[in-house]
Amino acid sequence: MGKSDKTIAKMRNNPRDWRIEQLKTVADAYGVAYRQPGTSHVTFRHPNGAKLTVPAHRPIQPEYIKKFVRLMTQGIGD
C-alpha cells in the first residue's frame, strides 16, 4: 500500500480537516488531472471523464472529501 493509498484510507475513515494541497497530491498519484482557474475552487477530472469541483476554502466539507475518495477509487464524479 503506497502513501497515497494510505491517505485515501485516512480520508475514508475521517473526512474532516483536509486541505486542498493534500487532495492535489493524491490526485497526482492517481493520475487525475486538476485545474484551479481562480482561487476559490479546484476541478478534478478523472481519466474516464468524471469530474468533481471542490471549494478550496478550509476546512473542506466532509461531503466533498467523500466524493473525492469515490472519484479516486471508483472514477465516479458529481
Model-derived segments and spans:
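Basic nucleic-acid-binding interfaces
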Residues: 2-36, 46-78
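Minor-groove-contacting beta-hairpin "wing" of winged helix-turn-helix DNA-binding domains
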Residues: 41-45
